[in-house]
Amino acid sequence: MTAAFTVVIPARYGSSRFPGKPLKTIAGKPMVQLVWEQACKSSAERVVIATDDARIVEACQAFGAEVLLTRDDHNSGTDRLAEVAAQLGLAADAIVVNVQGDEPMIPPAVIDQVASNLAAHPEAGMSTLAEPIDDVAALFNPNIVKVATDINGLALTFSRAPLPWARDALAANRDQLPAGVPYRRHIGIYAYRAGFLHDFVSWGPCWLENTESLEQLRALWNGVRIHVADALEAPPGGVDTPEDLERVRRLLEG
């Protein structure tokens, strides 16, 4: 049985890499609507879109979503979730799932999975998902975040760089994946308890988070354990660039 949880979808208009991304149309709908529709197919008790832009609020209201206008000075999507959890009055032990607003093809099953994993691992403050990397180009792509875990499935670290660096194998050949190294791609979906979100904001960003532009590093920096499991279904990949948008359009529009 899936644990009770609320989905929050952070959606920023002013992305430095791809401004206006949540409202880009795919199959005749704004991308954020597709994300919301996938989240609504999960077992979530509630699905809320959180944004700092009135244009996104208007678009979300037009397709019937619950949407909250948040401050525009948050350092990360998780900071925005903390404000939403406070606005919603969620109990400290309530589970909140962060579904990125640029994942229009996120499988509902993985939304349920990440919530259930957090409920099953009280030693972890967060849970997230990953999948194997089987392409050397993905290993060197900074838009694909790599994760390494310990024997208990808890994250050691995340990086945009190849992780781990197979010194001898990559010195000899960078055109193929080193044999025997279980490289994994991080999937940008998280579950937290609402009380943790308050702590996350109180810590503020750390230098490692700022350097990599990876908010989950703030949790590791402060000693929080992050449970990582391989996804039950592999998402086809999110939309980070205009090229990604065209790829997703081809998949969904035929």
UniProtKB/Swiss-Prot annotation:
It is found in: Cytoplasm. The keyword Nucleotidyltransferase applies. It catalyses: 3-deoxy-alpha-D-manno-oct-2-ulosonate + CTP = CMP-3-deoxy-beta-D-manno-octulosonate + diphosphate. GO terms for molecular function: 3-deoxy-manno-octulosonate cytidylyltransferase activity. GO terms for cellular component: cytosol. Keywords: Cytoplasm, Lipopolysaccharide biosynthesis, Nucleotidyltransferase, Transferase. Coiled coil: none annotated. Pathway: Nucleotide-sugar biosynthesis; CMP-3-deoxy-D-manno-octulosonate biosynthesis; CMP-3-deoxy-D-manno-octulosonate from 3-deoxy-D-manno-octulosonate and CTP: step 1/1; Bacterial outer membrane biogenesis; lipopolysaccharide biosynthesis. This is 3-deoxy-manno-octulosonate cytidylyltransferase. It comes from Pseudomonas syringae pv. syringae (strain B728a).
